[in-house]
Regions:
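Single-stranded nucleic acid-binding surfaces, predominantly the OB-fold ssDNA-binding core
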Residues: 1-100
């Protein structure tokens, strides 16, 4: 699996750094991609960290906007954490390559 990073050069919405896609290179998902990941500047704590949002579908219930995660852990969140770290590492590589 590879991660494709598309930088957010327009700066809109504020705080969004890039979009990410997972491209599957082997196994039953070979030739497919999973889109909808975004990398954001972390707003809380002022630590300058980064956050990854996962693909989700938004919908309304009684006028309230809600979100339904499309990629979910089966049992615990460690698998989700691994994908998050993979995307952040790919973004760091893309950022370093752009600065070089």
């Amino acid at each position: 699996m590879t991660v494709k990073i598309t930088p957010n050069d327009r700066g809109n919405p504020p705080g969004k750094l890039a979009d990410a896609e997972l491209h599957f290179t082997e196994g039953p998902l070979e030739g497919l991609k999973l889109i909808g990941f975004s990398i954001w500047e972390q707003r809380r704590g002022g630590g300058g960290g980064r956050n990854v949002t996962f693909p989700a579908r938004q919908y309304n219930v009684n006028g309230e906007r809600r979100s339904f995660a499309l990629l979910r852990p089966i049992v615990d969140t460690s698998a989700q954490d691994g994908v998050r770290e993979l995307i952040l590492a790919a973004y760091a590589e893309a950022e370093a390559a752009a600065a070089a």
